[in-house]
Amino acid sequence: MHRIAVPAATGAPTAQEPVKVAARNLDFYYDKYHALKSINIEIPEKRVTALIGPSGCGKSTLLRIFNRIYALYPKMEARGEVLLDNENILSPKYPMNRLRSKVGMVFQKPVPFPMTIFENVAYGIRHHEKLSKADMQNRVEQALRQGALWDEVKDKLGQSALGLSGGQQQRLCIARAVALRPDVLLLDEPTSALDPISTSRIEQLVEELKRDYTIVIVTHNMQQAARVSDYTAFMYLGDLIEHDRTETIFSQPSKQQTEDYITGRFG
């Protein structure tokens, strides 16, 4: 039986770590289609949690609920609770601007804005804070450093972001997300459109970013989940089948469905 090699586990089990995000009895509907079914999961603070499962299992849907991006589209409904620092972000009383500043998101395909590299990073900050020119410059530099991009673009901040390579554009999107200093960073298959070298750089970056951020990453690449995550959740047909330490999921899963998936018997 083929097993994916994983690093040795570090830190304490989920139950002993501070919980940053928690879904409680979460159901989600696309019109009448029941996409997520009574999901209960706790995301530990300043750890990387990977969501894995076959296409259509609900992992990207769950990710989008964590920042309520689904609310931009009609006929979508979430029921239950998603707690961020023990506050229910699904409540109509939870301010959307506050949520956007606390939960950043990076998508599968890099989406730089058609503006300069500097303005790409400054854009979100301007909508949430009023900074002096010097403070803005410092903030943009800090974000680009966190995105591991500063050394490559520091002399061309006034150039269009559209001229960057795909890997650079994705790191710019990460820098743009962390520029607001969120608590949580959501990554939806952030390397699926990138070459192996760019993928490796993003994975290294994820490892660095978890010192400051709680990270949830959706990936179809189980080797990637094994490399970058501390915890892994396996989803199938809208159900959360198993959630545990990554080392446990890939070496001693408790559910047969999980074992069948990670050993390539389906999916």
From Swiss-Prot:
GO terms for cellular component: plasma membrane. Keywords: ATP-binding, Cell inner membrane, Cell membrane, Membrane, Nucleotide-binding, Phosphate transport, Translocase, Transport. GO terms for molecular function: ATP binding; ATP hydrolysis activity; ATPase-coupled phosphate ion transmembrane transporter activity. It comes from the Bacteria. It is a peripheral membrane protein. Its main location: membrane. It is found in: Cell inner membrane. Its EC number is 7.3.2.1. SUPFAM superfamilies: P-loop containing nucleoside triphosphate hydrolases. Belongs to the ABC transporter superfamily. Phosphate importer (TC 3.A.1.7) family. Part of the ABC transporter complex PstSACB involved in phosphate import. Responsible for energy coupling to the transport system. This is Phosphate import ATP-binding protein PstB. It comes from Xanthomonas euvesicatoria pv. vesicatoria (strain 85-10). The lineage of its organism: Bacteria, Pseudomonadati, Pseudomonadota, Gammaproteobacteria, Lysobacterales.
